[in-house]
Amino acid sequence: MHIRTVGYGHPDAVALDREVQAEYVERYGEGDTTPVDAAQFDPPHGIYLIVYDPDGTPLASGGWRGRDSGEEGYADGDAEVKRMFVVRAARGRGLARLVLAALEDSARAAGRRRMIMETGTRQPEAIGLYTSSGYTPVPKFGVYRFDEGSRCFGKALSGDGGDTGDGRGADRDPGRTRAVGAP
């Protein structure tokens, strides 16, 4: 397995985005209506990653885009996770956790202070991933901030257990490995 940085408009990114949107339709009755501009994922203000198997098949994706304070509830220094997705055939192998760790590392290196994401109650596996990775609930933000089924989480990227926006803070596991399946 290897992780590759690609543009959000890359053909593999587009194909994976179609798959995640189809899954949103299955779970919620519609796709994600959050406005997304491909340029938001261009370094150093964002990144988009794809995990490939040894044969070059795309298995998982995720990106972050820099967000700062404004009317939608963001804070200065936020990195918002978008389009985290693992194809069904590759689920349960730690790929989402691998992508999330790589996104955190990239956002930290870009000077972002907090990683945030929004998910919904119909994605309990996503909520489980984020909470088991040290994310805690934060005030709602973004397009779905008024949706009752929306859940927002955050994690400080400073490495010092700093504030995630809810006053509780979070620590990052410094021993996290980048190899899939490693202990």
Where are these regions (language model features)?
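Acetyl-CoA-dependent GNAT
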Residues: 1-82, 87-88, 100-102, 106, ...
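Conserved catalytic-core motifs of GNAT/GCN5-like acyltransferases
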Residues: 8, 116-121, 127, 131-132, ...
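Active-site acidic-Proline motif in GNAT/NAT acetyltransferases
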Residues: 87-89, 93, 121
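Conserved amphipathic alpha-helical interaction elements at protein-protein interfaces in regulatory
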Residues: 92, 105-109, 132, 136
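Residues forming the Rossmann-fold NAD(P)(H) cofactor-binding site
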Residues: 93, 97, 101
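Accessory recognition modules or surfaces
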Residues: 97, 149-158
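Conserved GNAT acetyl-CoA-binding A-motif
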Residues: 100, 107-119
